Design a protein with these regions (language model features):
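Glycosyltransferase catalytic domains, chiefly GT-A lineage
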Residues: 1-144
């Protein structure tokens, strides 16, 4: 396995997009199956069913799932409770056993190989796409 973790968060509402995104990465990212992958979900906020986990495992048999429980995410004020699942993206900063973490949202499509950009992103920074000089779009980040 390569030492760059592919990571996302997911619940049942976004399974169709996730399956398309993962399939598109599998098709376009060089050596995709050599990257470890972890999918975060939260049974306390918005769960990912066993059935949907199995659908993902058919695409990426080595995928790991982690059920996150963090009381802060449940207590934080939000306009719409369904948006609490977005707090799980903060968990992509926790893994320290990898050289980098590539965090992606499941509402995207990979249309060409992005591995060079991931592998050459600076190790000492968080690289994102979009945004401005003051902020980034947190839907795609490489954490070094």
């Amino acid at each position: 396995m390569k030492n760059i973790l592919f990571m996302t968060h997911l619940d049942d509402k976004f399974i169709d997009g996730a399956l398309v995104m993962i399939y598109s990465m599998k098709k376009n990212v060089k050596d995709f199956m050599e990257y470890p992958m972890k999918i975060l979900h939260s049974s306390a906020i918005s769960d990912l069913s066993v059935e949907n986990r199995e659908k993902i495992k058919k695409l990426v048999p080595h995928v790991e799932f982690e059920d996150i429980y963090n009381q802060s995410y449940m207590d934080a004020p939000v306009q719409y409770p369904k948006h609490r699942v977005a707090f799980l993206s903060l968990e992509c900063f926790r893994p320290t056993e990898y050289e980098k973490v590539f965090f992606f949202d499941c509402d995207m499509l990979c249309i060409r190989d992005i591995s060079e950009g991931i592998e050459t992103a600076p190790n000492e920074y968080v690289s994102g796409c979009g945004g401005s000089i003051d902020d980034i779009n947190c839907g795609l980040m490489v954490i070094g």
